[in-house]
Design a protein with these regions (language model features):
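Alpha-helix-loop-beta-strand connector modules within alpha/beta enzyme cores
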Residues: 138-143, 219-228
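Active-site metal-binding motif and surrounding structural segment of the metallo-beta-lactamase
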Residues: 75-91
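Active-site microenvironment of metallo-dependent hydrolases
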Residues: 25-26, 34-60, 64-65, 73-74, ...
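Active-site neighborhoods of metal-dependent hydrolases
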Residues: 155-213, 246-250, 255-398
Length: 490
């Protein structure tokens, strides 16, 4: 018997077609969303990425969007700009906690040396708000400063700011005592500077020898009130000076960072580092730094050269050198320069290579340049560490060097600002401050004869996701640097 009804095949075919179209449309919508999510502003392709916090060391692609790292992938990623990093090192940009020279020219040198953030923390700025305003929307790399104890003290004791000076000149405002009312006024100025964005309190005890131990403790208390670190240039008596500031940190609770322990302690540096290690083992928040040169630099009219400097440091006039000419000083030339009203920097040859090598290799030390114009460390500190300590001496592993230059400084800053938690790491969610370098080629070129020669070997540098070095050259006209400021008052 023949069944009733027509042929259902056209209807089935039509239904299948409708379903297929719907699936295709849904797939297109979902794929479009996914494709939009997976397309990045910048992709770094095929580089060997290093994250010093997690110890990740692997070849990956890195996706960047909106100034942040948003993807790290074993598979290739797509982006508006793809940087081929095959055979190159990709690491968090270096953070220099100790950079006095905060000019546009210095920022270019720092960038060529792999630095994405350069901060003036040892001495700080006499006017934090002015410092930040001058650089807003005009900086190649990130910047910031501390509140300045030397300049606050000088202002209260009657010494105006000297244009071009890093520290106040030696005089009554640096060498004389402050009475209780003056100490209170210094404290108040520092609180105001912290409120303006200071990352901590910069304390130059050797540059203000008139400040008693009790006065210094009160400056530590100002930082401790806000949970900010103190960044300290110690008094100059080596072991006793380090003991003084560790004790001040212990009684006030202020986080303590001791600057350039290599030059502050010289031949006593190993014992000074043991003091730091002992303090840390007992729960104190104490950190330190070093730079890879046997010579330091400071202003000749500062209290650093008050009477007795030769005996204290075991050096003579001939160990002092004029940066621009290489001239070694005599007593007469020293006194002539010392009497000048203009701030003049002088190089001090006062350390040994063996001692510097020991300090740089110590796990406690971060790398920081103490950058000043005329000294090669202003241009070449980080490249020098890679060349001499990673490649040549092999006293640092590649990861150790990156950790000392990026992650450890970021950890130090976390007590100052939450922004630091996104610095010094190569992780999803971190700021895209990244250095891409040729490990075999990265080295310093600056010397005492040619201190302004930039390092070579950094192929690309990104600051907040924007390339500032592209193919080994500075990108003209870009200013992606941002202020790193202290947390608001509670």
């Amino acid at each position: 018997m023949k069944e009733s009804g027509g042929d259902d095949r056209p209807r089935c075919t039509f239904s299948f077609l409708v379903i297929a179209i719907r699936i295709a449309l849904l797939t297109l919508v979902l794929c479009g969303t996914a494709c939009a999510q997976d397309h990045y502003d910048v992709v770094i392709h095929g580089g060997r990425i290093l994250d010093p916090e997690t110890s990740l060391d692997a070849v990956r692609d890195v996706g960047i969007r909106g100034g942040q790292i948003v993807a790290i992938s074993e598979r290739p990623l797509a982006g508006s700009r793809v940087i081929d990093a095959t055979g190159l090192i990709v690491a968090p940009g270096f953070i220099d906690l100790h950079q006095h020279d905060q000019t546009a020219a210095a920022y270019r040198l720092k960038a060529m040396d792999g630095v994405t953030t350069a901060l003036e923390l040892e001495i700080g700025s006499p006017d934090v708000r002015k410092f930040l305003d001058q650089r807003r929307n005009a900086a190649l790399i990130n910047y910031g400063t501390s509140a300045s104890q030397p300049w606050a003290r000088a202002a209260v004791l009657g010494q105006p700011v000297v244009e071009g000076a890093i520290v106040p000149p030696s005089g009554p405002a640096t060498n004389g005592p402050a009475n209780p009312e003056q100490v209170q006024r210094i404290e108040q100025r520092l609180r105001e500077e912290l409120n303006a964005g200071g990352l901590g309190v910069g304390i130059g005890i050797q540059y203000t020898p008139g400040a008693s131990r009790l006065e210094i403790i009160e400056m530590f208390r100002v930082a401790a009130e806000r949970g900010r670190p103190v960044f300290v240039h110690v008094r100059g008596d080596r072991l006793e000076s380090v003991e003084e500031v560790i004790a001040a940190a212990a009684v006030t609770g202020a986080p303590l960072h001791i600057v350039h322990i290599n030059s502050s302690c010289l031949r006593d540096a190993p014992e000074c580092l043991r003091l730091v290690a002992g303090a840390r083992a007992r729960g104190l928040d104490v950190t330190t730094e070093a730079y890879p040169y046997i010579a330091g630099m400071t202003q000749i009219n500062s209290a650093r050269f008050n009477p007795g400097w030769k005996e204290k440091d075991g050096i003579d006039y001939s160990d002092l050198m004029i940066p621009s000419t290489g001239e070694r000083l005599t007593k007469e030339r020293f006194e002539q320069m010392r009497a000048s009203q203009q701030p003049q920097s002088i190089i001090i040859v006062d350390n040994t290579q063996a001692m510097v090598d020991q300090v740089i290799a110590n796990p406690l030390t971060m790398i920081a340049s103490d950058g000043l114009p005329g000294h090669p460390r202003n241009a070449g500190t980080f490249g020098r560490v890679f060349a001499q300590y990673v490649r040549e001496r092999q006293s640092l592993t590649l990861m150790d060097a990156v950790r000392k230059m990026s992650y450890m400084p970021a950890l130090r800053l976390e007590r100052s600002t939450p922004e630091a938690r996104k610095k010094g790491r190569l992780q999803v969610g971190a700021d895209a401050d990244l250095v891409i370098l040729d490990l075999a080629a990265f080295h310093d070129q600056s010397t005492f004869e040619k201190p302004f020669e930039p390092s070579i070997g950094v192929r690309f540098l990104l600051v907040n996701g924007s390339p500032v070095i592209d193919g080994g050259a500075i990108v003209p006209g870009v200013t992606p640097g941002r202020a790193i400021v202290g947390s608001p008052a509670p």
